[in-house]
């Protein structure tokens, strides 16, 4: 999945390697969508789910968490439950790692190192569901 630069805080395109499990869930979700363009549609048919919708759903469910907190949970899981490379886990979150000089030389997207992380994360999430 490609997140366009204009949607990213860093204004740089971010490629997210989706696991087979996530791709299957997205394919399954299509049947509930009212749009060919969006998998998750909002209240207005054919329009995407709004930016604040997930937060509103969590609030409705009386959950004491935020969408951004999911990122923290992922990072903590990577650090405490896996032995994945620090740089690769940071790249999963689209974090800039190292000094400006190091960043100038690290130009790859690390997709081959990030894919197994996302596969294992999907399995972990599914095991808790």
What are these model-derived regions, one by one?
Residues 7, 12, 17-65, 73-74, ...:
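Active-site/catalytic core of tyrosine-dependent DNA strand-transfer enzymes
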Residues 2-11, 23, 46, 83, ...:
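Catalytic-site neighborhood detector that most strongly recognizes the C-terminal catalytic loop/helix
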Residues 65, 75, 83-95:
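Active-site-proximal segment of tyrosine recombinases
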Residues 1-3, 16-18, 89:
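Short beta-strand motif preference
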Residues 66-67, 109:
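Residue-level "hotspot" positions that anchor or transmit function at local structural transition points
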Residues 60, 77, 81, 124:
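Active-site catalytic microenvironments for nucleophilic, acid-base chemistry
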Residues 32, 81-84:
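Alpha-helical structural elements of signaling/regulatory helical domains
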């Amino acid at each position: 999945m490609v997140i366009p630069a204009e949607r990213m805080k860093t204004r740089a395109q971010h490629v997210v390697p989706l696991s087979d499990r996530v791709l299957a869930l997205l394919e399954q979700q299509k049947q509930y969508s009212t749009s060919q363009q969006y998998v998750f549609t909002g209240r207005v048919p054919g329009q995407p789910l709004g930016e604040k919708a997930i937060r509103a759903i969590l609030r409705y469910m009386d959950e004491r968490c935020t969408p951004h907190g999911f990122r923290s949970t992922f990072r903590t899981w990577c650090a405490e439950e896996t032995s994945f490379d620090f740089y690769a886990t940071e790249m999963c979150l689209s974090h800039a790692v190292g000094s400006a000089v190091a960043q100038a030389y690290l130009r790859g997207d690390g997709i081959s190192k990030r894919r197994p992380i996302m596969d294992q994360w999907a399995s972990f999430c599914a095991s808790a569901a």
